[in-house]
Amino acid sequence: MQMLSSGSPAGCISALDQERLEALIERNFGEAQRVNPAVSAVLKRLRNAGVVARPELIPPGLVTMNSTVRLVDSESGRVWEIILVYPEDHDPAESCWSVLHPVGAAVFGLCVGDFADIPDESGVVTRWQIAGIPFQPEARGFLTM
């Protein structure tokens, strides 16, 4: 089975992530989804993906749900590792960031080498580069996580 390239300009997402996230957003936000910037960003990425692929075809350098993502601050070089999770598992103290939080929404669907502009609690935006994905479920054969 051939892996997809993650370099597509329109992006690539997992069909499983798309299905689960669209249902989650519809169920929890309904018409209010347009007023939440993080939710809007995730929906935009889901709807504008150039490729929606079966989990086993997802390239290992793509940020998918339940991935561990290594970020590097483009100015200071500071390293930050986060785990991209569903809202019910959001726990910043454990480095678990919901895909529907600005941190998670900023990295979802990006690839190693891409940049994400992430605001802190005070609204100051820092540019982070996706430096690596130490764990991605699809790359390890966990195709239903």
Task: Tell me the role of every PLM-derived stretch.
Residues M1-P60:
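N-terminal intrinsically disordered, low-complexity, charge/repeat-rich segments that act as generic
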Residues E31-A38, R47-A49, W80-L84, A93-S98, ...:
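Generic detector of short, locally flexible boundary/turn motifs and exposed helical patches
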Residues S40-H90:
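Long amphipathic N-terminal alpha/beta scaffold segment
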